[in-house]
Swiss-Prot record:
Designated name of the protein: Carboxypeptidase S1
Sites where the protein binds substrate: 343, 398
Protein EC: 3.4.16.6
Family: Belongs to the peptidase S10 family.
GO molecular function: serine-type carboxypeptidase activity
Record-level GO BP terms: antibiotic biosynthetic process; monocarboxylic acid biosynthetic process; proteolysis
Keywords, in A-Z order: Carboxypeptidase, Disulfide bond, Glycoprotein, Hydrolase, Protease
Source organism: Penicillium janthinellum (Penicillium vitale)
The protein's enzyme class: hydrolase
Reactions listed under catalytic activity: Preferential release of a C-terminal arginine or lysine residue
GO CC annotations, alphabetized: fungal-type vacuole
Positions of glycan attachment: 200
């Protein structure tokens, strides 16, 4: 890999590394690592994963929370003052193989089969940079990360236990936090939330009451039974069926019922934001060479996505996995921008209220309170013990793009093992 390519992070004295680590035979997983801008010797380590399934984490790096971003259609990036490496050593990872700059053999067909390769990457990273082995570690992710985040965290905890018991050889990963924004976690809750959110949200009514009634009928008589069958049998055929039944009856009809961006309902479907400029930049041969990439950048290639679809991974619930991660005691944040449709805040809120942990009764009974950043109300939140929910005002799917200061504050609080709180 390449040290200090001069691309993206231009803060003097802040080191960066980009390149590949082997996670299996002919499996070259791309990572881009940035030291913390402040106190890198003590700062925690945080990994960022975009969703998809099969989308590159370079999206997050360049559009959301990385050291540089593209402003107003500029063709070259400028420094991002709200970068998450202000407070953490950040590693952005392209997974599974075939996504982004990662290349080689891809045998990942589901969230569960993706997890071991992510663990392999962390082990390979520690072998190269042993000074990070003892650091606090956090996973932050969005969208399909509602599947990835809970499963990756849970797998790491299982591996830690196996290492302690002597049945697995490897380095303990000191996981302390998980953050999932606008996540797809539980289809039973979130398919219904499409209907409720589309009828009643802060920005625009997408469906009228008679459409809502017919969609609720379709949910109860078509989508829900299919999801229950997937959940009960766990079979590929039942789960792929649930995926298509719910799409045909709920998501498809609503998303085609008006001209809106499913990632930001304030905008029309041809919304140019967040700008795609970064992907043009990452196809520049000079840039590719400088960072040590060996393949053409693919933002969200079809191949990996289709493998997940073929096993019916999407409608499989990760609510119980999320619950077990909260029960393990690590600091967990479920958060969402309030203008996103596809993984809307309402579905995320109802998932959060359903998380099974000792504080659930207290948590689900709590009303949301104002969340302020330097005295300005930027959203609403609630927190009990090690579990928090945050709704962010004026933000689409990629929250840090729309509300960078709010996102940075929430990130900082969670990685420092604190409940989120107003400032």
């Amino acid at each position: 890999f390449v040290k200090n390519s001069g691309i993206c992070e231009t803060t003097p004295g802040v080191n960066q590394y980009s390149g590949y680590l082997s996670v299996g035979s002919n499996m070259n997983m791309w990572f881009w690592f940035f030291e913390a801008r402040n106190n890198p010797q003590q700062a925690p380590l945080a990994a960022w994963f975009n969703g998809g399934p099969g989308c590159s984490s370079m999206i997050g790096l360049f559009q959301e929370n990385g050291p540089c971003h593209f402003v107003n259609g500029d063709s070259t990036p400028s420094l991002n003052e709200n970068s998450w490496n202000n407070y953490a050593n950040m590693i952005y990872i392209d997974q599974p193989i075939g996504v982004g700059f990662s290349y080689g053999t891809d045998d990942v067909t589901s969230t569960v089969t993706a997890a071991p390769y992510v663990w392999n990457l962390l082990q390979a990273f520690y072998a190269q940079r042993p000074e990070y082995e003892s650091r606090d570690f956090a996973i932050f992710t969005e969208s399909y990360g509602g599947h990835y985040g809970p499963e990756f965290a849970s797998y790491i905890e299982q591996q830690n236990a196996a290492i302690k018991a002597g049945s697995v050889t490897g380095q303990n990963v000191n996981i302390v936090a998980l953050g999932v924004n606008n996540g797809w976690i539980d289809s039973t809750i979130q398919e219904k939330a499409y209907i409720d959110f589309s009828y009643n949200n802060s920005y625009q009514q997408i469906i009228d009451s008679s459409t809502r009634d017919s969609l609720l009928d379709a949910y109860n008589n078509q989508c829900l039974p299919a999801l229950q069958q997937c959940s009960q049998s766990g079979s590929t055929s039942d789960c792929t069926n649930a995926d298509s039944v719910c799409y045909q009856n709920i998501e498809g009809p609503i998303s085609s019922s008006g001209d809106f961006d499913v990632y930001d309902i304030r905008e029309p479907s041809n919304d140019p934001y967040p700008p795609k400029t970064y992907s043009t930049y990452l196809s520049d041969p000079t840039v590719v060479k400088a960072i040590g990439a060996r393949t053409n950048y693919q933002e969200c290639p079809n191949g990996p996505y289709n493998k997940f679809a073929s096993t019916g991974d999407n409608p499989r619930s990760f609510l119980s996995t999320l619950s077990s991660v909260v029960q393990s005691g690590i600091n967990v944040l479920v958060w969402a921008g309030d203008a996103d449709w596809i993984c809307n805040w309402l579905g995320n809120y109802e998932v959060a209220n359903a998380v099974d942990f000792p504080g659930n009764a207290q948590f689900s009974a709590l009303d949301l309170a104002p969340y302020t950043v330097n005295g300005v109300e930027k959203g609403q939140f609630k927190t009990v013990d090690n579990f928090s929910f945050l709704k962010v005002y004026g933000a689409g799917h990629e929250v840090p793009y729309y509300q960078p200061d709010t996102a940075l504050q929430a990130f900082k609080q969670i990685i420092q093992k604190k409940p989120i709180s107003s400032t």
